[in-house]
């Protein structure tokens, strides 16, 4: 378990920059992910960890990439139906076979299928403990849920109490440090919808400054006009404690 966690978090900084491109498991070929081999592959070398589905790992990611992978382990839903209605979509045997560093599943606190999503986390944690595989719980938000400190404090703590070793959640401007303080395992933030680059870097800096252990971003990287430059700027914030202003200057210089 600790060995795999060390693949995720840089031993010098204790933090991580994950590149998430697992969106296709329920969104299909969304903008920026139509051709992963063309649009996403050039970013692999600039990420600490790749987050994807086993189908993409096997079909698109070259074995020589040599990057740790967090595998999407929940699914069986789509944007055409209720998003929270997920099942476990990956066996632990296959996760081990693919040499992944963790598995990830959504947890939908307060949604119609809350109970099933929590059971999915429990199932993965139990199976993972037998083989030393960490589970990352991803806090999905129902359509009618308010994205605030109280909600994410509840969701992250429940996931940690169920045994998840890492939590992926959203940054909130008010009270994020309370979310981190109330969660006994590392938190990495999701990027969410595409933002202007300067705003994304400010969000990264604020999250790290308030205790996050890293970021797990997708659209704010691969939908950027200059994704490699954006990856380098995010790395500067997470691992080198650069401010958002300095990281944005780096982004501007790298995009030339």
From Swiss-Prot:
GO cellular component, one term: cytoplasm
Keyword Protein biosynthesis: no
Keywords of this entry: Cytoplasm, Schiff base, Transferase
Catalytic activity as recorded in UniProt: dihydroxyacetone phosphate + acetyl-CoA = 3-hydroxy-2,4-dioxopentyl phosphate + CoA
Presence of the UniProt keyword Cytoplasm in the record: yes
InterPro entries hit by this protein: Aldolase_TIM, DeoC/FbaB/LacD_aldolase, DeoC/FbaB_aldolase, FbaB-like
The enzyme's E.C. designation: 2.3.1.245
Compartments where located: Cytoplasm
Chief location: cytoplasm
Active site: 168 (schiff-base intermediate with substrate)
GO molecular function terms attached to this record: fructose-bisphosphate aldolase activity; transferase activity
Protein's job: Involved in the degradation of phospho-AI-2, thereby terminating induction of the lsr operon and closing the AI-2 signaling cycle. Catalyzes the transfer of an acetyl moiety from 3-hydroxy-5-phosphonooxypentane-2,4-dione to CoA to form glycerone phosphate and acetyl-CoA.
Similarity annotation: Belongs to the DeoC/FbaB aldolase family.
Oligomeric and partner information: Homodecamer.
Name used for this protein in its record: 3-hydroxy-5-phosphonooxypentane-2,4-dione thiolase
Organism placement in taxonomy: Bacteria, Pseudomonadati, Pseudomonadota, Gammaproteobacteria, Enterobacterales
């Amino acid at each position: 378990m600790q060995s795999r966690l060390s693949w995720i978090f840089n031993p010098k900084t204790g933090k991580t920059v994950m590149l998430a491109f697992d969106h296709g498991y329920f969104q299909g070929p969304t903008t920026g992910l139509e051709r992963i081999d063309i649009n996403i592959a050039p970013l692999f070398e600039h990420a600490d960890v790749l987050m994807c589905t086993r189908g993409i790992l096997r079909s698109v990611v070259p074995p020589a990439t040599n990057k740790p992978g967090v595998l999407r382990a929940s699914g069986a839903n789509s944007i055409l139906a209720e998003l929270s209605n997920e099942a476990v979509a990956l066996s632990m045997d296959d996760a081990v076979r693919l040499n992944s560093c963790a598995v990830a599943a959504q947890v939908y606190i307060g949604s119609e299928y809350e109970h099933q999503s929590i059971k999915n986390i429990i199932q993965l944690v139990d199976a993972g403990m037998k083989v030393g595989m960490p589970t990352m719980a991803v806090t999905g938000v129902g359509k009618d849920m308010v994205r605030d400190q109280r909600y994410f404090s509840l969701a992250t703590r429940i996931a940690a109490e169920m045994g998840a070793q890492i939590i992926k959640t959203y940054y909130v401007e008010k009270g994020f440090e309370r979310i981190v303080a109330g969660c006994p395992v590392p938190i990495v933030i999701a990027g969410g919808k595409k933002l202007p680059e300067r705003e994304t870097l400010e969000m990264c800096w604020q999250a790290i400054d308030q205790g996050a252990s890293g970021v797990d971003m997708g659209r704010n990287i691969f939908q950027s006009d200059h994704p490699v430059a954006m990856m380098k700027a995010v790395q500067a914030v997470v691992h080198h404690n650069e401010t958002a202003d300095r990281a944005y200057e780096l982004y501007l210089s790298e995009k030339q």
